[in-house]
């Protein structure tokens, strides 16, 4: 029996559910109230949609006392959403605020648990050009020089390879139309950059801000001038 694509398509066709899923693309957990606010819907409506998404296994929930926190189910769910963004019609910008939000997202953002946008794509390009990575089909492979480079950054390549997920997948960036680095390596890079405060998460959005020290580090370590 073929998978029921129509059921998933029906779920994603609802604007409120789509908005909730896009909010969860930052890779973090969110309480229902916050997701309702971000989707501009009532809490009761958000609960209805969250239950539908849970039934479809697109999201998961964690219970802490009386509170429930939601996240995307896994990287496969995130990949489906990211691919749909490539073919979805672009929303018309209606205000200066929306224009700035769009610009911020295009520049640097999280794509579930890795870095995307202009900065993410430039990082991938630079690592390939420097010979740290090479593209093989739709994956990135770490070279011997790359293994030493990532080790110096504090990323254990073997540890990342042993995770139960793709190691370094080419993820097509919906705004740049080029690949950035997904998978365990992409996540390890994002985590390391957050730890070193090269980048910081912006509140209530997937947008990422590059710090002043981060701009220096990107140029020094990654040969990416921001």
From Swiss-Prot:
<dbReference type="GO" id="GO:0032791">
    <property type="term" value="F:lead ion binding"/>
</dbReference>
<dbReference type="GO" id="GO:0003700">
    <property type="term" value="F:DNA-binding transcription factor activity"/>
</dbReference>
<dbReference type="InterPro" id="IPR052543">
    <property type="entry name" value="HTH_Metal-responsive_Reg"/>
</dbReference>
<dbReference type="InterPro" id="IPR036388">
    <property type="entry name" value="WH-like_DNA-bd_sf"/>
</dbReference>
<protein>
    <recommendedName>
        <fullName>Uncharacterized HTH-type transcriptional regulator YdfF</fullName>
    </recommendedName>
</protein>
<dbReference type="GO" id="GO:0097063">
    <property type="term" value="F:cadmium ion sensor activity"/>
</dbReference>
<dbReference type="GO" id="GO:0010288">
    <property type="term" value="P:response to lead ion"/>
</dbReference>
<dbReference type="GO" id="GO:0003677">
    <property type="term" value="F:DNA binding"/>
</dbReference>
<dbReference type="InterPro" id="IPR001845">
    <property type="entry name" value="HTH_ArsR_DNA-bd_dom"/>
</dbReference>
<keyword id="KW-0804">Transcription</keyword>
<dbReference type="InterPro" id="IPR036390">
    <property type="entry name" value="WH_DNA-bd_sf"/>
</dbReference>
<keyword id="KW-0238">DNA-binding</keyword>
<dbReference type="GO" id="GO:0046686">
    <property type="term" value="P:response to cadmium ion"/>
</dbReference>
<dbReference type="InterPro" id="IPR011991">
    <property type="entry name" value="ArsR-like_HTH"/>
</dbReference>
<keyword id="KW-0805">Transcription regulation</keyword>
<keyword id="KW-0678">Repressor</keyword>
<dbReference type="Pfam" id="PF12840">
    <property type="entry name" value="HTH_20"/>
</dbReference>
<feature type="domain" description="HTH arsR-type">
    <location>
        <begin position="1"/>
        <end position="92"/>
    </location>
</feature>
<dbReference type="GO" id="GO:0010468">
    <property type="term" value="P:regulation of gene expression"/>
</dbReference>
<feature type="DNA-binding region" description="H-T-H motif">
    <location>
        <begin position="32"/>
        <end position="55"/>
    </location>
</feature>
